[in-house]
Every structure is written in C-alpha cells, then in structure tokens.
Amino acid sequence: MNTLKFTKMHGLGNDFMVIDAVSQDFTPEDAPIAEWADRFRGVGFDQLLVVGRSETEGVDFRYRIFNADGSEVGQCGNGARCFARFVADKGLTDKKEICVETANGVIFPKLSDNGMVTVNMGKPKFMPSEIPFVPESGEGDDACIYGVHLESGIQPVSCVNMGNPHAVIVVDDVECAPVRETGSLIEPHRQFPERVNVGFMQVVGRTAIRLRVFERGVGETQACGTGACAAVVAGIRLGLLDEGKTVEVVLPGGTLYIEWACGGDVMMTGPAEAVFEGELAYS
C-alpha cells in the first residue's frame, strides 16, 4: 500500500490535485487517476498536476498534467499558475520567476507580491498540422476560420494551439451558448485527431470578452487558462479585439488577463489558491 500527500488547489474554480514528486516517489502511470478525480467517491478535480525535477540544464521543474479521465495533456494555463504557487509555498524554490518544462515546451511563470501569477504561455500555433486539425472545406493553411462538419451543418471555428488544441466559436450571448451540446460533438470530432478544447466567446468590447470552455477529457469547467489565451488570440486575428492590449476574459469562475501582439508570446495573468492538504493510500 502506497501513501501519498497532495494539495488541492484551484485557479478561478478550475481545480487540481497537485502532487509533489520531488519530495516523494510517485509514478502517475500506476495511479488510479480517474478514481481520484471522481467528485463523489474521490478527491474530485479537473486535472492532476505532477511537480517533478527537470533533467534539462537551466530548467527548474518538470510539469505533467493529467485530465480527469487519466489522459495526459501538454499544457494547462490555470494549472501553470497553481504549479508556480505550489513550488513557492512548499519551499521548493525561492525564485520569483521559474523555468518549467512541459510536454509541449518551456513556460516561465512569475509570481507577484499581490498573489497573482503571470505566465508566458509561448507563441500560439495556427497551421492545421500543428493543431492538429483536418480541413474538409477547402480552406488553406493558416486560415482564421475553418469549418467543422456536423450533422446539423458546418460550424465555423478558429483553431489555435496553445500547447494544447483549441477551437474557438464566436457567439452573441455566452450564457445561452450550447456549450455542452455543441462542445460534446466537436471535442471528439474526426477533424481533430487528438480531440480538442472548445471555447465559446462573446465579445463585449475591444478589450473584453466572456468565455465558456468545454475541455477535452473533462467537460465544461469553471475556467480554462489556455482557452482564454486561445480565445483572445482568435479574437485578435479576426479583428474583433485590440492587438497588444490587455484583454479582460470573464469566465464562470472569475477573470483572467491576456495580452498578445502578433508574432509574440501570449502573457496570462490570474490568481492561484490552495484549498486544503490531504493524504491518501492506494495500491
């Protein structure tokens, strides 16, 4: 029987079970992640975050993310902020800005004295092969809008990879958007070979949007950091939002602040909070 210490955290209600694999032995491939994610019979969370040491010179930590269904993903923005807060609170680093290795590249979270965390999320990708996405409507590479073929018709989406794949849909009223219905159709769609996160974006002004996200392997969540980044990038490319300005992204769980200038890195700022400490036994 194995005993494991963990911390429950959240970023705007997007909640995580965070495991320190620096100070204790833990192999996620051997863990019953889906059972732990169960909100009635387990710890309950959207994603499991594993904090490890990196073997790459100049990199402080390795960051692994597992969805509630046990599948591993390459990036999670809200998780990145919680990761940074966790390693600081646990005394694993005394740096204000850390270098973190993920499955899809390196990120640079920075902690502020006011409790907010800013993360350089890197450059967005748009080519269908980078999403990945399979166009079926004759669109060229790097198009701002692609068509997803549903039984009800063709759904226009903007495709952005922010370390994980996103399809962004512009809606008039996010409160009335068919997030679960349409999200559950697009998330596993054949045109997205690795499945996709589906964002529903309402543009409020040139520097403000409202957003709901149906996450891959999870369903709708209270907040999605990479989803907020993808939505702002898509809005700028579509001419709906101002480039180089800080855009306020209001999600069900709270507000994130995203900034992007074309060709540059995406910057995300938001809170990260610990909820409780726990310990469990598993075989």
Curated annotation (Swiss-Prot):
Transmembrane segments: none
Gene Ontology MF terms: diaminopimelate epimerase activity
GO cellular component, one term: cytosol
Enzyme class: isomerase
Primary subcellular site in the record, as a coarse category: cytoplasm
Residues the record marks as site: Could be important to modulate the pK values of the two catalytic cysteine residues: 166, 215
Pathway note: Amino-acid biosynthesis; L-lysine biosynthesis via DAP pathway; DL-2,6-diaminopimelate from LL-2,6-diaminopimelate: step 1/1
Protein name from the UniProt record: Diaminopimelate epimerase
Gene name linked to the record: dapF
